[in-house]
Structure formats: C-alpha cells, structure tokens
C-alpha cells in the first residue's frame, strides 16, 4: 500500500499538486483499502478518510494506515474536507461542478483530473496480480460449467442465473458496468452480433453460436474473458469465422510484450481479420486495461500512442459480428511481461455442444 501511495503522489506532483482527493470508490480503495461512501485525502503527511458515521466503523477496520474522521454527509463532508486542506494544491477525481467550485473558493489550486489515479493504477503490483489470477481461474471454471449446462431450449437468462449463482458462491460479483443492464453478456444466434448484447429470454436453438462474456469482480478486481460456443449443427460459415477470430487473437497475444505499442497489438489482430475479408465486421478496439474497473488504461486500439509496460493488465479480444446472423469473440485477460502471461487456461478451440 505504501508503494501505491508513493506512486500516486509522484503522478500528483507531476501536474503541480501536492494533495490527492478521491471521491470515486475505485480510487478510494486503491489509496486506502476501503471501498465505501467516503472521501480519501493523500499527501506527504499521510492518508485521511472522511466518512459519515455509518461508514466509520468499516473504514477503520478495512483501511490501511489511514486516519478516519467522522463527518456529516453531502455538504457537511465537503466542509470537513475543505477545512483539512488549507493551503493545499489539490488534484481531485471529482467531476461535480459544485464540489470543484466550492474547493476553488478556498484553496490555491484545484485541478480536476483522474490522470494520477489511472497512471498509478496502470501497473499492477504482486498482490493485484495474484487476485486477478484467482479471479481468472474462477472464470475458467464457469466456462467448464457452460459446457455442462448449455442446451437447446435453455434461455440466455436461465444460463446467466446458473453462472451468477456459481460465481457468487465463490465470492465473485457483478461489476456495475454501465454499458449493459445485466451482469454478464450471454448472446445466442443473432444476438451475438451485438458486442454488448443484453441478456434476453431468447432460447438457444440448434445451429446457434453463443457468445459468453464473463466480466466479474473478485476482492475488488475485475477479470474479463469471452468464449464462443457452438450448439448442435454449426454452419460452415460459422466455423470459418470462428477460426479467423482464433487466429486473430493468437496473433494479438504474440504481439504482446513490454515496450511494444498498444497499436501494434491491435494491428496484429485486425490484419488477420481484414485479410480474410471480414474487416468491416470487427467493430471495436482489440482490448483495454483491467483492474479495479472493467475498462482502464491502456486502450489497445489503432488510435493508441501508448507503449505496453511490464505488469500492465490488459485484454485481447478480437471479434467478428455478422448482423442478424451471429457473432464470435474470443477474449483473455493477461499480464504484460516479456510476452503475454495469459491468465485464462480454458481452451479456445471451438467447442460444439
């Protein structure tokens, strides 16, 4: 935790500030070890948590090397915060206009920026990597469960219920990802052509390609993987598309290494799909950072100017989406080393159930 705090302050100092103020729960947790309704303050003097009475007990119990101060909620918490920041040059992750203006009235420098938080969180420490690997192993177990459970006549919603029950029994929970209403993406047949498909009551039928994207939180950290299964008699086209996506993902994984550009990983995946004539059906970036949030830095995209660094945690997830027909996506979470340290062991060969 001390190394994390040192890194946070290093990035804070780079933008001309000496104090970090965290409102977002992910940043609060990274800074303090406590996830809840509170404000975190970090400077060279130490770390303080400003929390309402209902959170004080848990904040004291769960935080690491933090002073916990009780406050009122809302404006009361902001008043307590400002009173503790006299003369501070503040960087905050808040985007709330009223909060920022109130701070600016009382403090010499207030910079709204998530950059110090995201830059520090980009590189995972050994504890974070250990948690991510455990989370990934549970997702592998869930894919084994898919092989046993998926059947003709089962609905996407029914499969999600089975999988979430298994996950929650093992300490994994939904991430609160804002692009979907459901905790998982389970998309059969034509629904699979929608990368962020909502889980529906549609029942699986013979010939379906079924995209199962598992993105779940374990001890605060998110693991993310996707496998696509076939059900019954699978068309020649579906098998062909699956093999192209598999080759694309393998090329992307081979391109991953410390000091390689994020763009080069995207290029490696995209060239395979384009060469096979499906380029216009690969409609998203190749991957993203993972950690305390589903999508973190870096972005694995043809637009990215970032170079990979050792111990970044990223995904590689090419896909082909044929409207009104089916989709195929294959995704792994991995740790960047001299090569890709893939955290998932479940096969990427096409399984036809």
Residue ranges with predicted function:
Residues 1-353:
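Active-site neighborhoods and metal-handling regions in enzymes and metal-associated proteins
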């Amino acid at each position: 935790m001390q190394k994390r705090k040192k890194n946070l302050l290093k990035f804070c100092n780079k933008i001309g500030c000496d104090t970090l103020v965290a409102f977002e729960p992910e940043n609060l947790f990274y800074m303090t070890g406590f996830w809840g309704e509170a404000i975190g303050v970090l400077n060279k003097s130490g770390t303080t948590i400003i929390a309402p009475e209902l959170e004080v007990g848990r904040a004291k119990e769960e935080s690491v090397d933090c002073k916990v101060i009780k406050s009122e909620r809302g404006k009361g918490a902001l008043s307590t915060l400002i009173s503790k920041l006299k003369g501070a040059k503040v960087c905050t992750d808040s985007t709330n206009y009223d909060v920022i203006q109130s701070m600016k009235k009382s403090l010499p420098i207030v910079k709204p920026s998530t950059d110090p938080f995201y830059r520090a969180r980009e590189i995972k420490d050994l504890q974070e990597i250990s948690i991510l690997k455990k989370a990934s192993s549970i997702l592998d177990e869930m894919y084994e469960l898919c092989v046993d459970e998926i059947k003709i006549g089962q609905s996407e919603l029914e499969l999600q219920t089975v999988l979430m029950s298994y996950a929650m029994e093992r300490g994994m929970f939904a991430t609160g990802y804002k692009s979907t209403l459901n905790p998982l993406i389970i998309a059969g047949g034509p629904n699979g052509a929608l990368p962020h498909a909502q889980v529906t009551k549609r029942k699986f039928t013979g010939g379906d390609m079924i995209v199962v994207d598992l993105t779940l939180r374990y001890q605060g950290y998110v693991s993310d993987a996707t496998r696509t299964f076939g059900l019954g008699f699978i068309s020649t086209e579906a098998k062909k598309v699956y093999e192209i996506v598999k080759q694309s993902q393998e090329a992307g994984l081979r391109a991953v290494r410390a000091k390689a550009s994020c763009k080069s990983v995207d290029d490696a995946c995209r060239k395979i799909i384009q060469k096979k004539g499906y380029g216009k059906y690969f409609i998203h970036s190749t991957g993203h950072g993972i950690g305390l949030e589903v999508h973190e830095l870096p972005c694995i995209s043809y637009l990215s100017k970032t170079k990979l660094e050792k111990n970044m945690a990223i995904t590689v997830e090419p896909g082909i989406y044929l409207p009104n027909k089916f989709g195929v996506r294959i995704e792994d979470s991995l740790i960047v080393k001299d090569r890709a340290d893939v955290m998932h062991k479940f096969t990427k060969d096409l399984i036809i159930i």
